[in-house]
Amino acid sequence: MELSSVSSFSLGTNPFISIPHNNNNLKVSSYCCKSKSRVINSTNSKHCSPNNNNNTSNKTTHLLGLYGQSRCLLKPLSFISCNDQRGNSIRASAQIEDRPPESGNLSALTNVKDFVSVCWEYVRPYTAKGVIICSSCLFGRELLENPNLFSRPLIFRALLGMLAILGSCFYTAGINQIFDMDIDRINKPDLPLVSGRISVESAWLLTLSPAIIGFILILKLNSGPLLTSLYCLAILSGTIYSVPPFRWKKNPITAFLCILMIHAGLNFSVYYASRAALGLAFAWSPSFSFITAFITFMTLTLASSKDLSDINGDRKFGVETFATKLGAKNITLLGTGLLLLNYVAAISTAIIWPKAFKSNIMLLSHAILAFSLIFQARELDRTNYTPEACKSFYEFIWILFSAEYVVYLFI
């Protein structure tokens, strides 16, 4: 809406308000629909004709748009009437929230979308994306090396296997939030559970259901005792990490061991299952040996950086982490340094064994990832390590985690 001297708005109250014309500014609060701040010179409006400032009698001024006919949520609007010598201008500012008309079907669809969005946020999207990319790239590499073994049923089995792995991932993320509610009210008050967007009962359902479904899928796929054991190990690791009386997360060493078991188990199980599905025997290829070593050392950075944004809550509830002991800045420098050493080792590997890897891809990709890490660490330092910036930095480490598996496809 643009305020002007002529308006077709219908008014819910008396449209004429008596305003004293003196040397004082007058603020009249009203309601209006959305408009950016506008300044209307009253000399161009028939409703605010200029008068001599010596005239101190009350004039009747027609204020427009007190109650406009619009489908919107109404927000306060301020009118400021200036004195005549200053041009009798009116400054209006307004904010609204759209409220479009919704049919029953549209409203139900919106509710479903909102629920799915909250569920997706609850299972920590950055970890889920990392697991999906990891699984896809490990399986994709085997297909690239053995294209003659491709078949549609094989892809279907691979998708079911990925869903099983995601089940353990969702369980680990969910069980941690359920038992960290008090801490998260301080560290992450915007999470779906502590913010009240989902109930505790719903959280338990979203946590246990994926784990059970994943276990059923593992059995249905006839994955064998090894993969079934690895799945159970992932569930066990997520449990002892978060659930009392274990709460391994309260000690930085045991927390690292849990995270290492989860990531190492994921890496090995997907590779083993991929080769088994293709009818190939398990073998430690140079590329898989490299990605296993790289991800193992990268887990050090993930484990040390995961609590950067949680320092305040962890200290209050007596949770000892590397971040609470050493501080956000020192942990960032430590984690960044370890990961940079990892990239240097990757570049050195490409130089030392040029026949085992595609050296050009190894060199260029890891150099780019290393410089991007340095840039993000500098950006974090400039923010003085605020919780929001620390959270973004940790999620960026997960992006680097995923990027390494993409590189693995082509080395």
Curated annotation (Swiss-Prot):
Pathway info: Secondary metabolite biosynthesis
Range of the transit peptide: 1-91
Gene3D superfamilies found in the cross-reference section: UbiA prenyltransferase
Which InterPro entries does the record associate with it? AtHST-like, UbiA_prenyltransferase, UbiA_sf
Keywords, ordered alphabetically: Chloroplast, Membrane, Plastid, Transferase, Transit peptide, Transmembrane, Transmembrane helix
Per the entry, the cofactor note is: Cannot be substituted by Mn(2+) or Zn(2+).
Q: What pH-related activity note exists for this entry?
A: Optimum pH is 7.0.
Q: What is its main location?
A: plastid
Question: Catalyses which reaction?
Answer: a 2-acylphloroglucinol + dimethylallyl diphosphate = a 2-acyl-4-prenylphloroglucinol + diphosphate
Q: Which cofactor does it need?
A: Mg(2+)
What is its membrane topology?
Answer: Multi-pass membrane protein
Cell location? Plastid; Plastid, Chloroplast membrane
Q: Write down the superkingdom of origin.
A: Eukaryota
A molecular function (GO) held by this record is:
prenyltransferase activity
Task: Indicate whether Plastid appears among the record's keywords.
Answer: yes
Expressing tissues: Expressed in glandular trichomes called lupulin glands, and in early stage and mature cones. Detected in leaves, but not in root, stem and first stage of flowers. No expression in male flowers.
PANTHER family to which the protein is assigned, alphabetical: HOMOGENTISATE SOLANESYLTRANSFERASE, CHLOROPLASTIC (PTHR43009:SF10)
Family membership noted in the UniProt record = Belongs to the UbiA prenyltransferase family.
Put simply, this protein is called 2-acylphloroglucinol 4-prenyltransferase, chloroplastic
